[in-house]
Amino acid sequence: MPSLVSTIREDFRCKARWCYGDASRRSRLKAMLTDGACATILYRLMQWSRRRRLVPLELLFNKLNAALCHCVIGRGAEFGPGLVLIHSNGVVINGAVRGGARVHLEHQVTIGAERGDVPLLGDDIFVGAGARILGAVTIGDGAKVGANAVVLCDVPAGHTAVGVPAVVKAPRLAGDQRREAA
């Protein structure tokens, strides 16, 4: 399991690539000053405290994240390295959610349970502003969820979900791939 410091480094490396197009030291430092940086660090500290069974500290980091960053990430939620909270305001994530590496979340995103079932997110996911992912759905590796989409069904790897309720769209093919597919 990666250390707290290495996980946070990877979070900001990914955020620097997202925001500035590279992961240079300067870009990583700038990424640490962006919206969502405080929420990311508080979430990682909460996760670290939970693994060490430091419940009072875990609760403190959870409540600080909600009060200071308006970001509610359930205490049991697990995300791999490279979590990017583009803007943390209004993010709500159920404590049973599992997410892979390099998950990118915009503001006002809800990832929650429906009748006790929770979503599972793969690696390299993007979730647009205001999107809702609810229930026992799987979001495959490299999938995208459009802004304000309400996802109630699985999104296969590389596909995009848009609309209310969300409709899954296949990935667009580049020019040469389109001709070969025809």
Per-region residue spans from a language model:
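Short aromatic-enriched loop/helix-cap "lid" or pocket-rim segments at secondary-structure transitions
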Residues: 172-174
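Left-handed beta-helix
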Residues: 69, 74-75, 80-81, 86-89, ...
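Terminal amphipathic alpha-helical/low-complexity segments used for targeting or macromolecular assembly
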Residues: 1-69, 176-182
